[in-house]
Swiss-Prot record:
UniProt KW Iron keyword: no
Residues reported in the UniProt entry to bind Zn(2+) 1: 73, 75, 88, 91
Cofactors: Mg(2+); Zn(2+)
Highest classification ranks of the organism: Bacteria, Pseudomonadati, Pseudomonadota, Alphaproteobacteria, Acetobacterales
Record's protein name: DNA-directed RNA polymerase subunit beta'
Amino acid sequence: MRRMNELMKILGQTGQAMTFDQIKIQLASSEQIRSWSYGEIKKPETINYRTFKPERDGLFCARIFGPIKDYECLCGKYKRMKFRGIICEKCGVEVTLAKVRRERMGHIELASPVAHIWFLKSLPSRIGLMVDMTLKDLEKILYFESYVVLEPGTSPLKQFSLLTEDQYLDVMDEHGDDGIEVGIGAEAIKKVLERIDCKADKERLRQELKDTTSEAKRKKLVKRLKLIEAFADSESRPEWMIMDLIPVIPPELRPLVPLDGGRFATSDLNDLYRRVINRNNRLKRLIELRAPDIIVRNEKRMLQESVDALFDNGRRGRAITGANKRPLKSLSDMLKGKQGRFRQNLLGKRVDYSGRSVIVVGPELKLHQCGLPKKMALELFKPFIYSKLEKYGHATTIKAAKRMVEKERPEVWDILEEVIREHPVMLNRAPTLHRLGIQAFEPVLIEGKAIQLHPLVCTAFNADFDGDQMAVHVPLSLEAQLEARVLMMSTNNILSPANGKPIIVPSQDIVLGLYYLSLETPEFLATPDRNEYDAEGRLTVTGASSFATIGEVEYALSAGAIKLHDKIVARFDTVDAEGKPVRQTVITTPGRMLIAQILPRHPAIPFSLINKQLTKKNVSDVIDAVYRHCGQKECVIFCDRMMGLGFRHAAKAGISFGKDDMIIPAEKKVLVERTAAEVKEFEQQYQDGLITAGERYNKVVDAWSRCTDEVQAAMMKEISRQEVGKVTNSVWMMSHSGARGSPAQMKQLAGMRGLMAKPSGEIIEQPIIANFKEGLSVLDYFTSTHGARKGLADTALKTANSGYLTRRLVDVAQDCIIVEDDCGSERGLTVRAVMDGGEIVSSLSERILGRTVAADILDPATGEVLFKRDTLIEEAQAEKIEKAGVESVLIRSVLTCESRVGVCGLCYGRDLARGTPVNIGEAVGVIAAQSIGEPGTQLTMRTFHIGGAAQRGAEQSMVEASRDGHVTINNRTIVHNSQNVPIVMSRNCEIVLTDDKGVERARYRVPYGARLLVEEGAAVTRNQKLAEWDPYTLPIITEHSGTVEYLDLIDSITLVERMDEVTGLTSKVVVDYKQAAKGVDLRPRLQLKDANGHVIKLSNGNDARYFLSPDSLLSVENGAQVSAGDVLARIPREGSKTRDITGGLPRVAELFEARRPKDHAIISETDGRVEFGKDYKAKRRIIVKNDETGEETDYLIPKGKHVSVQEGDFVRVGDPLVDGPRVPHDILKVLGVEALSDYLVNEIQDVYRLQGVKINDKHIEVIVRQMLQKVEILEPGDTTYLIGETVDRIEFETENTKRLNMGERPAQAMPVLQGITKASLQTQSFISAASFQETTRVLTEAATAGKKDTLNGLKENVIVGRLIPAGTGSVMNKLRAIAAGQDRQRLAQARPVVSKAD
């Protein structure tokens, strides 16, 4: 084999990336470093400045590293190939290839050992953990500030205690002959490390762990134990962290390049190496001269510092700078960051055969074509042209061919045409946010210098023609061309991988043209369907004209007999289910007949599909239907024709934009005046002390935002009015069709601009009443500048943040690949329609489409099985399930998939971009990451302060029925107040609307204290009010009548009277009682007594006591009589600035990073009754006591938080005790994986839904699966795990199976949720983690543990230069594994023959 390798070297085929299965990283011993080295470097010189030859024994020495020219020694005695392998006796250089200078290493023998800075300073310090010292003490020893006692002997000193210079001298005087051993510097630490016996220490520490009780000590021991175990298992020795010699990397990797003018450009590493060599040589000389100790020690310290700088400059002390005052780039910096080796050269490479140019629109191209400028094509396809020129005998040599191409001879162009035929090229537009950012096209040669792009693919590329540039790449090999054609051709990417909807949809002008064609004019609606005659048979009303064929319609159109929008009766030819032609008579317009003409004939595509006004959404539905029923080819042809039709008629229609198209509604003045009056009224209420300042502000902002909406509605009504004889408003057509503009933009042009936000995000309560058509006043203009500027600044930030989110997502999900068809999992997720405020936001059929059924679906009415387990739900099945009235379906999900690596096909379901079951080898993780990250730039950056600027809707203060139905009230606990209105007393009351069949259609939460306006079982109509409440305060309501008594409400300690400066009215407010005298355990509350002075008992058996949290406003006096349903106190919900709702991108990032939100909810972990325990310092104690088991769970809650439960309330698992956003970790711990996935999917979908972005749930599930890769050990059983250790889930399951098979106790663990950054850094693969973030830390950790990287993910494989194990690469991997096995067998059989050749 060795011979074979040498032969390969001569042929220039060195080391293939395919010949290994895993990569291991570990510490190198001095012997290993010596074995790599080809010689010791003794001098700091680089090259001779006169001869430019490398100095002997210097950093570029040819004797050590190899010759400078191929097969030529330095002195020139031996030249040419025939002397290969000879070592020149004069200059000592081996005659071989010059490229060995890229692979041969040297070394420097150090005069004194030095510590490796990575293992010293990377936290936690590995050397520190091994010797059990703090980093501070270690540094004192290593940098020669303090001595350390290694062996106390018989002296009273402790082992490893530090001594200063003076103490050291005293100790040596006193105990010099007691066998004491004291050391300093790296030598001392090395001695300590040498004495460590990992195996024995491991046992000792395990024992100590069992015996220890203190938590802090346990944590420390666990850390140490893990490290010592890693050393024991990996055959590394701890003393290797201290180096006796350092390797020198090959000279070609740190080149010295002569510039013109006799100067040299050099890599920073050479400077760093030179410092090390200089100091090392000086130290050697000082030791030989027997210099005083202090000088030697100083030199040793400097040597340590220079080695530190070489490995990681700037990690300790000031960074060493070069001549131009910038820090030198050390070995660590070469790997780190965006410019480091990993991200710059290994993950992203520049490629040849590529070019870029500006793009222009190419409306006459077919969908699979792009226009490529001739000049570019000539350059890109040069080698192909040369070979063809030779083949056809136009040129005899490559040189001649080259000349012909340079002169651009006519035959060259003919050959170019031939070369390009059916050779796809790839177009890419940066930023490539999802896989549709690179697509393949067939080039069409064009004149000019700009690339032509098909208009329909612009959506996928997110391209427009305002100067965008695109890059072209040529796939060279046949396999690459095949992949480009089969997988990446634009015609194969009709559906979006994010949501399975068509992405090749017409937009802008095309939509406008189609909308205009299919317009319903008032004349159309006024024309009757047929002619009407009177009794004498005279024509009284002219109806729609009739036509027999589409041809006749076209003829009449061109003759001017009918107009595009007249009503006609025509015949439409289509086919039935058997494929036989049928004709149907339709009432329609000539315009729609033109669209029908290009429609594919198919029974599932009826004329009614286009016999309506075609808005952008309708057009998308048509394309979707054509794709689903007629297949891809028909769909592509249809899209191209549709584009042509749309463009042609948009041009003919001549729809334009005039200022008079913007109509200011007449009602505007009335609406504004009415709102101004309301605002005045609120001001008055505030002056009279009926409402607080915060409430007034809230009400004012609400009133204005309602007014703006009403003005907008009036304007839209005005603009969309159609009258006979009048042309339809152009601007309305543009907006309504979805071509351009939105009601929100039109509102600013012709309605009123509305509310604006201040820099802090608060809303300015004075709105801009004017619009752009009327013109803004100076003050209006000034108010609006801020918002406009913030918008621009936000956009810039947003792009960066969104890109970073995508990067983290890709990193965490990159190794999630479909590995098998079925994992056989029995588990799944229960899915139901998503409701929001009673509206169905996403129906059940939408959510289960393209998923696999996990358990048989039964018809709720008959109980028969609709669909069996493992059925893939297609459109038809989803509709059937929805029609049957099924409420929830158990579907398989990647979260419950039991595949060991990757996921299985059935758990994933349909491949959204193809509409078929997913293939093995599909990289679903990366697709998920791209689908979530790509719309990131469309999300907002703002943190909404209760519903951000000007977008805020009015506070919700009532529930209206969204449809007709019957009312059911869940958890109905009510009292009737003095007006006999029922008041809701339960914390989780819900109103459910059901239809006639009893199927739930809407569900509304009704808050505590709301007034119920309907009874159980009542029939309600749409928009009927069901309940209402005050949105600005949380009330505390009594359920009994009685006399109020204040408890612990002591003036100026817990209760103050606050006077409002503006109104002069006072209110009683409960304050935080920190000033109270110690020992007085005050808990402000109200209690109710009956006529006899006894405390009233409530229905649940508790006393009627109501606890008051700080900031409550009391509504009753001490001793007052109250009746049931009265409000005792109210807690204001602070307006504008209350809890900030984190919205948009930051919210998505917060969820994926699994951060604990500010002011989060505290949820109950058990069922039980609430009791208030004894307070603890600044916290309140809530106890939840389970009645059956008698278990008690304590919760400590900061005093300022509002507790949402009262004493004696019954809470269930997962109910909030304190309101606020929920913490995902708590949900996982208390309610399990399914609830967590439900929560995360819904929260993330809410953010995207707000922007109208559709993403399939399964993408979010894939990411959540990756966040749940680890488990935390609760009970180690007989395994070697430690309590509290986080272990990989798969590793944990393997270990447990092993223990069970051996008849031992398995470990127990619970799943932990990790944020995406943390999960990426803790993947199995250290290469992937190192190329993500914190490179040095990851590599340090991997090296001490002697980690192996088995190259399972995509990223590791890209880095080592193999095909990725996904897509076509997964097949290749399998084949390669089989082939390698066969090769081994053959080699084994042929071995004796090889040895003879030796």
